[in-house]
């Protein structure tokens, strides 16, 4: 697997640093699976373990749990398919992830901090907060002088 998305790299980096709660962890698995499927057409236990920084048996255990909750269909050695419900959760998290990462990039906090904070916050923000943050980013980008002024101000 030569091409790796920025989102997968940021997930991997965040999971190198800290452990997260169960529901947050489930969302991260769904996010990684969706990203892998989009990138290469499928997701394997080994791929997931690499990006989540966990052992393949841990991935198998989580896949079984997500299968029981109807987020995906999993049969050992036969593949992983997200259900519509799993796709919805993954898509929601992926949208939040993109918006937060873009915001932290505007704040100019550095990629490492942006990745870590995005992974920490994406699971906990209200949808309205995300919508407003998207509007704010759009506003800032339509007024690049404000971003430039902020960057100059924050260097002081």
Q: Where are the regions a protein language model picked out?
A:
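N-terminal helix-turn-helix DNA-binding core of bacterial DNA-binding proteins
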Residues: 16-54
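N-terminal leader segment of winged-helix/HTH proteins
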Residues: 1-23, 155-156
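Canonical helix-turn-helix DNA-binding module
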Residues: 45-80
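C-terminal regulatory/oligomerization modules of transcriptional regulators
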Residues: 2, 122-156
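Residue-level recognition of specific faces of alpha-helices
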Residues: 32, 62-65, 71, 85, ...
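Basic, amphipathic "hinge/linker" alpha-helix immediately C-terminal to the N-terminal HTH DNA-binding motif
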Residues: 78-96
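A ubiquitous short alpha-helical element
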Residues: 15-18, 84-89, 102-103
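Arg/Lys-rich, alpha-helical DNA-contact motif
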Residues: 94-132, 136
């Amino acid at each position: 697997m030569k091409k790796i998305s920025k989102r997968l790299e940021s997930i991997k980096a965040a999971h190198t640093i800290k452990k997260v709660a169960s529901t947050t962890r489930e969302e991260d698995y769904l996010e990684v699976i969706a990203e892998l499927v989009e990138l290469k057409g499928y997701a394997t236990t080994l791929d997931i373990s690499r990006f989540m920084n966990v052992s393949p048996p841990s991935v198998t255990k989580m896949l079984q749990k997500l299968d029981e909750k109807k987020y995906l269909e999993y049969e050992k050695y036969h593949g992983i398919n997200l259900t519509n419900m799993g796709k919805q959760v993954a898509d929601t998290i992926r949208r939040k992830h993109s918006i937060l990462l873009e915001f932290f990039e505007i704040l100019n906090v550095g990629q490492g901090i942006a990745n870590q904070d995005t992974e920490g916050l994406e699971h906990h923000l209200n949808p309205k907060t995300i919508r407003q943050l998207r509007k704010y980013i759009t506003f800032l980008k339509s007024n690049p002088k404000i971003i430039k002024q902020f960057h100059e101000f924050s260097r002081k």
